[in-house]
Amino acid sequence: MSNPQSGTIGCHCGICEITVADKRAVQYFRCGCEDCRQGIEWGSSRKITKPNICTVKPDQLPHVYYIPADIISIKGKEFMSAYKLREDGRSIRLYCKQCWSLIAVEHPAYQSNVFYILPKHCVTSCDLSVPLTAILFMKDYPEDYETPPEDDVPLFYSFEYKQERQRFSSLPTVANTFKRRTDPLKGINFTELVNSLGEPEILNLERGKRFL
């Protein structure tokens, strides 16, 4: 296997950027969950209040790419801020406070091994050529949206039932992606970056609310 090359993930205004030791995405989902949608829409709605900032129309079914969590440099940390959508939320979202780009997202289930990015809502040089693994959380997909894509991949309505969770865990790349890292880091993991910013701000977003 060739030596990993570094890649960057930053904001649209260019003030914030992280560099990862390995730019190759290891997992790709499309996600219909409410949290992904609200996190994207909330950031995009903040941009609308600033006419000089370019806004992008969110995808109805976001493209979610997982990147190995080994960060070797950070630019503009003072302009980064961490948020949770609700008090009981588990995911932490990292935004640029100047342009409200959504830089990256982490969740305890990732065990600090990976974090995910939404490439339409950040600027990245990472290699996103990994094939689509699955379509997730279609339970939350709004009825007024377009018919979801018909990619020949597993589709999960929710993870409410044990059978669905087991079927998801049995996918070949999933177990590798969401396991604790054993190789030494060249830098710091995403959890360390988020923790260094202090307690995440709780947004208390109303469930079901649309922001765009």
Provide a role label for each language-model segment:
Residues S2-I9, C16-L212:
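A short Gly-Trp-Pro
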